[in-house]
Amino acid sequence: LRVDWARARMPVLAALKEEALNTKPLAGMKVAGCLHVTKETAVLIETIAAAGAEISWSGCNPLSTQDDVAAWLAAEGYSIHAWHGQSVEDFYWCIDKTLEFKPTLTLDDGADLIVRVHGEKSEYADGVIGGTEETTTGVHRLRAMGKAGDLKYPVIAVNDAITKWDFDNVYGTGQSTIDGILRATSVLIAGKTFVVAGYGHCGKGVAMRAQGMGANV
């Protein structure tokens, strides 16, 4: 199973899970997640559950859900509202279903769930004590809400963490962007002129990977 493959290659989460099984730091918490439903996220969900939390989950992208992983998580007893190829209506229906169990914590990627809690589903906001947001785009949305005085609970900007910049943004985004280009085009990158617009941590990673494959960047 793909989850086994991911679990074997995520030693930090494995160590945290082992510790959490004894300490239960999230006992009594109800976590609503809106992240990509992939084999890696499945390992995160297992870890959060091991820490004592109840879980309800939806996908943050209509096209990123790995259906076999979603089915496996559901079979394991987790509340999963996600499938590949959702319409816009499906996407928000799944977020709404995720919120129905009245979370105390939210985990978001793009801020769609958090914005929903502050808008159409504001009846759930009072029960939330905090959340996280992973992406630059989502953080911008939430900072605008905070500046306007509209943010109803504290949110940790995961994207501001140095480990996020220097590992995920540089190496993760760099590799996955090149992987996406290769899957879409099957083009040989060596010898090509490769233009990167923007030179933050993500752009730096893309430029490094392209240069490493022989492109003129």
Regions found by a protein language model. Name each.
Residues 1-26, 57-192:
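Glycine/serine-rich phosphate-binding loop and adjoining beta1-alpha1 elements at the start
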Residues 28-33, 157, 194-197:
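Short hydrophobic beta-strand segments
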Residues 30-32, 45-64:
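Active-site cofactor/substrate anionic-group-binding motifs, chiefly glycine-
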Residues 33-35, 108-109:
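Short His-Asn-centered micro-motif
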Residues 35-52, 168, 172-217:
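Glycine-rich phosphate/diphosphate-binding loop of Rossmann-like nucleotide-binding domains
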